[in-house]
Amino acid sequence: MSNVLITGCSRGIGYELARLFAQNGHKVLALSRNDKPIKELENKNISAFPFDICSDKDFEKLEEFLKDNWGTVDILINNAGQLLNKPFLQTSRIEFEEIYKVNVFGVAELTRLLIPKMSRRGHVVTISSMGGVQGSMKFPGLSAYSSSKGAVITLTELWAEEFKETGPAFNVLALGAVQTEMLEEAFPGYKAPVSAEDMAAYIMDFAMKGQGYFNGKLLQVSISTP
């Protein structure tokens, strides 16, 4: 069984990922600022504590947990993300920076911390968005969010090249519309064709097997617009 670290687990896809991995017997460290929903699952395979991906102190807490409990990590799923749906001219520098702190800098720091704890067969899966894919349809109000999701696509390609001799593998999934609270914030009233649970099942399977077939690749996981 694998040691799986997942961020953004308080709701939506991250919550369903933690639940599914644990149900299948894997050890899960589920990280999010609000750990109450995950703890309410009362699953012995899930460890959780409040974690702010922008907090140095929380990273120190994470290092201590890994040292004392796991030692190694097999799968990292960078799922945590923050949305801002706001016209560009009304978006302040601070608001723009906040999105990048979570969606880019936090992802980079967590990945940097975990790479030395992962084997050649390990797999880092970063969750991006179709809005971050070059040439995809773009939507007003998502300048900060979609550009940050484009940044982690490029980071994934760079990491795969830099660590191609030693591993782990790095891949990025650009998701289309999934029925989550974040989708409702971005596109109020839109009904997505895919549920959070169904998407989580796909991501879990890819995280377990995808490194045998892909490295440094962007996979567009979408059947609708948006």
Over which residues does each language-model region extend?
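Catalytic loop of short-chain dehydrogenase/reductase
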Residues: 125-151, 156-157, 161-164
